[in-house]
Amino acid sequence: MADIEDTHFETGDSGASATFPMQCSALRKNGFVMLKGRPCKIVEMSTSKTGKHGHAKVHLVGIDIFNGKKYEDICPSTHNMDVPHVKREDYQLTDISDDGYLTLMADNGDLREDLKIPDGDLGTQLRSDFDSGKELLCTVLKSCGEECVIAVKANTALDK
């Protein structure tokens, strides 16, 4: 039994909730909110006046932070909305495997190989820049159990 290696999971969490409640009236543009069960960035927000029978309503428009889809919702300003915990981290790209997985290195030197190359223009640009020998930093967004590369930039720290 002693010769069996312990399994080590890079992306474990404490089991805490992926969201926290916030009153609708306290939400702000460019903040995050859960719309239709998806983590979204608020791009538009408007408030209607209090009616004869009821609360002021807040109209929210958000863009899904992972797939770019637009979601809308209308809720009373006193209503509590779920706000996702969003973590943003930069990793240095060290390799791209044949099956499309990225090898990323964190600031502390830890390697991770569990993220696929993003779809669309971003993935195409990432691969062509890497193939041309550029040092790249990948920005990874993590929320609600999902992770994906959302941006790529040249690593200027190595030029000094």
Swiss-Prot record:
It comes from the Eukaryota. One of its GO terms (cellular component) is cytoplasm. GO terms for molecular function: ribosome binding; RNA binding; translation elongation factor activity. Pfam families: eIF-5a (PF01287), IF5A-like_N (PF21485). Keywords: Cytoplasm, Elongation factor, Hypusine, Protein biosynthesis, RNA-binding. The keyword Protein biosynthesis applies. GO terms for biological process: positive regulation of translational elongation; positive regulation of translational termination. Lys-52 undergoes hypusination, a unique post-translational modification that consists in the addition of a butylamino group from spermidine to lysine side chain, leading to the formation of the unusual amino acid hypusine. eIF-5As are the only known proteins to undergo this modification, which is essential for their function. The modification Hypusine is found at residue 52. Gene3D superfamilies: 2.30.30.30, Nucleic acid-binding proteins. InterPro entries: IF5A-like, IF5A-like_N, NA-bd_OB-fold, Rib_uL2_dom2, Trans_elong_IF5A_hypusine_site, Transl_elong_IF5A_C, Translation_prot_SH3-like_sf. It is found in: Cytoplasm. The keyword Nucleotide-binding does not apply. SUPFAM superfamilies: Nucleic acid-binding proteins, Translation proteins SH3-like domain. Translation factor that promotes translation elongation and termination, particularly upon ribosome stalling at specific amino acid sequence contexts. Binds between the exit (E) and peptidyl (P) site of the ribosome and promotes rescue of stalled ribosome: specifically required for efficient translation of polyproline-containing peptides as well as other motifs that stall the ribosome. Acts as a ribosome quality control (RQC) cofactor by joining the RQC complex to facilitate peptidyl transfer during CAT tailing step. NCBIfam families: eIF_5A. Belongs to the eIF-5A family. This is Eukaryotic translation initiation factor 5A. The lineage of its organism: Eukaryota, Metazoa, Ecdysozoa, Arthropoda, Hexapoda.
